[in-house]
Amino acid sequence: MANTTFSGPVRSENGFQQISKNATTGTVTVTSGDKFAVEATGSAGIEGTAAVYVTQVNRLKSDVDTNVNIVKSTIMIDLTDLRDGGTAGDIIGKDGDGVAFIAQVTTANQGTVFGVTMTCLETPAGGGTDIDLYSATEGTGVNDTAIGDLTETQIINAGAASAGTMVAGGDIAADQYLYLVGQGTGHAAYTAGRFLIEITGYDVAS
């Protein structure tokens, strides 16, 4: 496919997507500008009434020398109407309303992860403010159950969150589901609380 150069502005009403095309089958795959390949569905146990749950995956094109893409994956979530658990270490989510993972990290979608940050954009209220990020092999965790019941790894130990706090964490293994985990002891509904989770990875350009 030939390259095209534009001298004026290029506009798109609904955004841009980067794709790859299989030379044999012709199958087109969106590689950048799309949501997580595996994210929470509309009826899942992690979307609160504020309905602010957005994921985005973008690949920054490599240079010809390294042939490696930087992959930036972002999750924005509002905790309003979600609940923390009754015990420290319980999964945050909707009360009795399905699995509560926020996304799945895969090598094909996020690349090899080498860094994660979690920024608090709005101070949590109603529920506890000590909220951590975990990964787990299983995508079956629900609200008010222990993250320790899953095959889990703590990614970010955030401590008490308030607007403007940002905490960095370690890498995330392939094919892991992500959960927000409360460290409080109440089972209260959140009335506020917004977080931005940013995952940085890399993969070899195809």
Regions found by a protein language model. Give the residues of each.
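Surface-exposed, low-hydrophobicity beta-strand/loop segments enriched in small/polar/acidic residues
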Residues: A2-S206
